[in-house]
């Protein structure tokens, strides 16, 4: 079995590993993965490690209103109270197109997942029901992962990366932090949003369709995961579920990567990181890539192909399974 080296779970704690690569010119690239759910101290430790190093960081920028919402709504309840009416208002005009899209393009495995979710719906609480409904109404947009992650955080007494790190009043003012990610606010400036949505729902390219289906499967799987957490009363067992689930999923994804299977959800964002690495190593000798752990296998392969070799690693505890404060 292929080993995914960016995560470790010893049965007691879940760790993320920062792998440091160096080339013949002594330029170092620190591949510093981040788990979006963890202890507050975990995120403090990561920031302390980065310090003044040049840092490539991820954060999908949605519309300005969405960004403000994410920074102001610190709990799941606050988030859903604000965002759900907005989803209803914007996506109501596309409900007929969405139904046709689901009927025409859903594959056998997606339909199977939909049936599995429906079977679990009797266990839904109000939050899961709202998140599930919002997914359906909004075409299973990637922004729906955020409330799912908030639900898991609150069910395990853990923090979310976007709450633990101030991406509004702190990070944008750090001159050594370089935002390298999708920016839908800029992309939508010169695009007719209605035309774009209609095109994606009626005549998507094969690449876009595969991306959307992967996204839908990911969200449906996570909805089932929320139900499993709800049915598991002990916080320690929930944390164990998350830790073992992450290890299994990312190891499986890494095996697919080594077999050159494409992953369209991550590919575009990874290519942005790769271009930024090539740009920065021209003028800097110490660079951190601070990105979600799911991206790191592909980025590591790219760095190795650029002539870098492994030098050392640093370990960060994301959370303990049994926590006295949980």
Each predicted region: which residue ranges?
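Alpha-helix capping/helix-boundary segments
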Residues: 62, 295-296
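A short acidic, amphipathic alpha-helical/loop segment
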Residues: 41-49, 276-280, 299-302
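Extended hydrophobic/aromatic segments used for targeting, binding, or gating
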Residues: 285, 300, 305-306, 310-326
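Beta-strand elements within well-structured catalytic alpha/beta cores of enzymes
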Residues: 32, 286-291
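Structured, acidic catalytic/metal-binding patches in enzyme active sites
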Residues: 1-264, 312-323
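A short, acidic, amphipathic alpha-helical segment used as a generic capping/interface helix at domain edges
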Residues: 265-285
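C-terminal soluble interaction/assembly domains
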Residues: 274, 278, 289-291, 298-301, ...
